[in-house]
Amino acid sequence: MGASPSRPLEQSPSSSEGENHRVKYASYTTQGFRPHMEDALAVELDLDATTSFFGVYDGHGGAEVAMYCAKRFHTMLLEDVDYINNLPNAITSVCFRLDDDLQRSNEWRESLNPCANRNCLTNICANLHHFTEDYVPPSYEGSTACVVIIRGNQIIVGNVGDSRCVLSKNGQAISLSFDHKPHHEAERERIQRAGGHVFLQRILGMLATSRAIGDFAYKQNRNMPPSQQMVTCVPDIRVENITDDTEFLVIASDGVWDGMRNNNVVQFVRQELRPGEENLRETCEKLVGHCLHSNDNATAILVKFKPIEEDPDEVASARDEHQHNPEGGDEKLDINNDND
């Protein structure tokens, strides 16, 4: 059946929090009632001076693919040629690069468990031929990836699989991702064209998500490109503008969304974040705890947006223009020129 599942991880619930000039965040992750932990997350508040990164990775068949995604996704993003000018392209490129790493050799797994002694390099060199010739990619181990990049006045979301991102705008729940499930029409048609079928809402009766990093047992049709395999790593991309009514977003694994609908999550968080009672870490923990009856690992990142600050240079420029043209005619001066 291919590579055996990675060694299960058992861990206590963990949380983190932080902030910069744009956002505040908190995260919480728990193994729940599952025997092993296969979720992973990554947060880089300042990936660069203008960019924040958040990612949730829900593993299946083992934890190591999710762990590798959490370790490498944002670093690969920084390295991508489209990182500065075309983040949607960069996100897509990273998804395929991760798949390539997993297919090529065992080096990705070695990077998660570096040798602790000086014989490490010797051992790797001695086994390099074995890795490249006889290495078996993770056949039934894979991971979702739901990543959120905040840059300037935009939120860019890339999603592979059934983890999810939901935004609250003035109390309205806005889905910023699409759950890739085998029973959805477009996904089912691709699966069937690649030679598969959907049974009990799973691919071949086994896999409950139709897009993932890894899972190479479902990517074996030599007549199809990677984007048209039964399981593909092609992400859906969504770009949303940040406006004055943008409140917060939640990125979470399906252990959360299986327990609560989007609107319920938004209302739950809004209730917890009442003015004067704001505690993001506690709110995130309560949200995940509320969903533990789903019997799955559960991971959530809560990102709260700070009020949009006016650009001092833009305000000064607008003020000067107004002073030069005090009458202004019928034209209204808008010093908060947000592009929606």
Curated annotation (Swiss-Prot):
Alphabetized SUPFAM superfamilies for the sequence: PP2C-like (SSF81606)
Transmembrane intervals: none
Cofactor remark from the record: Binds 2 magnesium or manganese ions per subunit.
Enzyme class: hydrolase
Annotated ranges, domain PPM-type phosphatase: 24-305
Enzyme Commission numbers on file: 3.1.3.16
Binding residues annotated for Mn(2+) 1, in chain numbering: 58-59
Family note: Belongs to the PP2C family.
PANTHER family reported for this sequence: PROTEIN PHOSPHATASE (PTHR47992)
Protein name: Probable protein phosphatase 2C 21
